[in-house]
From Swiss-Prot:
This is 2-succinyl-5-enolpyruvyl-6-hydroxy-3-cyclohexene-1-carboxylate synthase. Belongs to the TPP enzyme family. MenD subfamily. The lineage of its organism: Bacteria, Bacillati, Bacillota, Bacilli, Bacillales. It comes from the Bacteria. Binds 1 thiamine pyrophosphate per subunit. The keyword Lipid metabolism does not apply. It catalyses: isochorismate + 2-oxoglutarate + H(+) = 5-enolpyruvoyl-6-hydroxy-2-succinyl-cyclohex-3-ene-1-carboxylate + CO2. Catalyzes the thiamine diphosphate-dependent decarboxylation of 2-oxoglutarate and the subsequent addition of the resulting succinic semialdehyde-thiamine pyrophosphate anion to isochorismate to yield 2-succinyl-5-enolpyruvyl-6-hydroxy-3-cyclohexene-1-carboxylate (SEPHCHC). Pfam families: TPP_enzyme_C, TPP_enzyme_M_2, TPP_enzyme_N. It comes from Bacillus cereus (strain ZK / E33L).
Length: 584
């Protein structure tokens, strides 16, 4: 018995210690029995920050949020059985959004598998193709070789999570009872520890000089180019992309998640209203780029994606450090395996300065005309969902974070988050674009990003109500703006809206909940606003005071649809008139 406890303590102690040596210092723990030894050791280790979350689905997204904000791996621990299965949605999102998670699941030992033991199921490769690597850890054993094995496996798995493309990995730990480690053991954290920690260093991919010279030569003869920046984790991309745009004369179509629309950098070349004006048929038929250079994930804008698809005669260059083909438009002609920074730097160094021509001035002119028209909605007294975004940005302080939920909030952010000299970070879950786990992801991010304002629809809010517990348990600061249109507002913009007979029951899905009671149950403050002045006051108050603050603004789905369509129609008229004037 003592030999078992000693082996358990030293073996798992070596594993936990190696996590911290490799800078994995945050773990989200869901309580359970079989995971007891790992949980206790993590709580005991002075280098580990532990966060408790009793709902595994919310816990997974909470860890995801911390990892997204810190831009480094975060561990996630649960017991055996369906607890592990509840991590699945967050693991899928982490995989597709390239966020490193270290998923740790406790398990029954081999003799208790497939024999009807309680809380035992097959956890081998549980997450399938949605993790970069899976390993079944050996049972604890008291030997130097096994202590070293625990550390080396940790090193390999973290390296896998961090190498491009980043993503989740899964370690499954079978353990036998008794499960309580012995903290009185001498040198508990030192077993298997060498003088040096094995770390896999990722170098920069160097583009062949022949390719760079060839590309510079080609681009020098292509006046009509576009730089498209999607969701990106590189904080320096704004400076490099704008320098490249200045050299080439190509406008930057900046997705809000690129974080190029706001900040202290020069935004002369940044186009922010393309989602609206690329709906114009005359423009789409007459504006034909020679080359498109795309960084990061695919943009949120459907109008931009459709525009990209139609450019079948253009050169399409997709820059991706992992070399993966993120090209749902199916038009890429070249995929460059290099970091965005390395690619931009190479071109900036060798590209001659190309004069800003009529091509850039056309994009800039139409962008400004579009923005002028869109800003008319700031005079609307009615509860227009697009104005939610502009009014939040108006009152957010320097250095704040705006987290946009999926469905309508991220689309309104795309349409109405205009360029700003304030440094405002925009975040979202755009891996698989689900509405689950949004509250938890934002709360995880709020540990690092303070102040943080989450904009979320009422159905998405309902979907992750359990996530609010983290705000109470860990005394987190967050302001949540609930845009309550009593249902799935996005479906009003889709063809399903025309099927009136079944629309409300299948797609509109009103649930008629009063969220005030839930918010107060979790120790938060709740306000239901009437009017834009009160809305701005409540958001500003929430962003500057501690705790959980929920601000609800009620909107009407049909009215919101009409306002969007009216604004789009007016914008299209302005654009068409402007284009026809230029052609005379």
């Amino acid at each position: 018995m003592n030999n078992h406890i000693e082996a358990l303590s030293y073996y798992l102690g070596a594993f936990v210690d190696e996590l911290t040596r490799l800078n994995v210092c945050d773990v989200v723990i869901s309580p359970g029995s079989r995971s007891t030894p790992i949980a206790l050791l993590m709580e005991q280790h002075e280098g580990m920050n532990t966060y408790l979350h009793v709902d595994e689905r919310s816990a997974g997204f909470f860890a995801l949020g911390i990892a997204k904000a810190k831009k480094r791996p975060v561990a996630l621990l649960c017991t055996s059985g369906t607890a592990a299965a509840n991590y699945y949605p967050a693991v899928c999102e982490a995989f597709h959004s390239r966020v490193p998670l270290i998923v740790l699941t406790a398990d029954r030992p081999h003799e208790l598998r497939d024999v009807g033991a309680p809380q035992a199921m097959n956890q081998f490769n549980l997450y399938g193709t949605f993790v970069k690597q899976f390993t079944e850890m050996a049972l604890p054993e008291a030997s130097e070789a096994m202590y070293h094995y625990a550390r080396m496996t940790t090193q390999r798995m973290i390296a896998s999570a961090c190498l491009a493309p980043q993503g989740p990995v899964h370690l499954n730990f079978p353990v036998r009872e008794p499960l309580i480690p012995d903290f009185s053991l001498e040198s508990l954290w030192d077993k298997g520890r060498g003088e040096y920690t094995g770390v896999v260093q990722q170098g920069n991919v160097v583009m062949p000089s022949e390719y760079v010279d060839s590309l510079v030569g080609r681009l020098s003869h292509m006046e009509k180019g576009l730089i498209i920046c999607g969701d990106d984790s590189h904080s320096e991309i704004a400076a490099f992309a704008t320098q490249l745009a200045e050299k080439t004369g190509y406008p930057i179509l900046a997705d809000p998640l690129s974080n190029i629309r706001s900040g202290h950098h020069d935004k002369t070349m940044v186009i922010d209203c393309y989602d609206t004006f690329l709906r114009n048929e005359l423009l789409k038929e007459t504006w034909k780029p020679d080359v498109l250079i795309r960084f990061g994930g695919m943009p949120v804008s459907k109008a931009l994606t459709q525009f990209i698809k139609k450019q079948t005669k253009a050169v399409h260059i997709v820059v991706d450090e992992s070399g993966q083909w993120r090209d749902p438009a199916l038009v890429a002609t070249e995929v460059v395996q290099a970091s965005d920074i390395a690619f931009c730097s190479a071109l900036i160094e060798k590209m001659p300065v190309m004069k800003k021509n009529d091509w850039f001035r056309m994009w800039q002119h139409i962008n400004e005309k579009t923005k002028e028209t869109l800003r008319e909605m700031e005079t609307y007294d009615t509860a227009f969902e697009g104005r939610v975004i502009t009014d939040i940005v108006r009152v957010l302080p320097e250095g704040a974070t705006l987290f946009a939920s999926n469905s309508m909030p991220i689309r309104d952010t795309d349409s109405f988050f205009f360029t700003s000299d304030k440094n405002i970070q925009v975040m979202a879950n755009r891996g698989v674009n689900g509405i689950d786990g949004i509250i938890s992801t934002a709360l995880g991010a709020s540990i690092i990003c303070d102040p943080l304002v989450l904009v979320i629809g009422d159905l998405s809010f309902y979907h992750d109500l359990n996530g609010l517990l983290a705000a109470k348990l860990h005394e987190l600061n967050i302001t949540i703006v609930v845009v309550n249109n009593d249902g799935g507002g996005i479906f009003s913009f889709l063809p399903q809206y025309e099927k009136k007979e079944h629309f409300e029951s299948l797609f509109g899905t009103p649930i008629g909940l009063d969220y005030e009671h839930v918010v107060t149950m979790y120790g938060g403050s709740f306000s239901r606003v009437n009017g834009w002045e009160q809305f701005r006051e409540e958001v500003q108050k929430g962003a500057t005071t501690e705790g959980l603050h929920v601000v609800e603004i009620c909107t009407n789905r049909d009215e919101n649809l009409t306002l969007h369509r009216t604004l789009w129609a007016k914008t299209q008229d302005v654009i068409t008139t402007s284009l026809q004037g230029e052609s005379k």
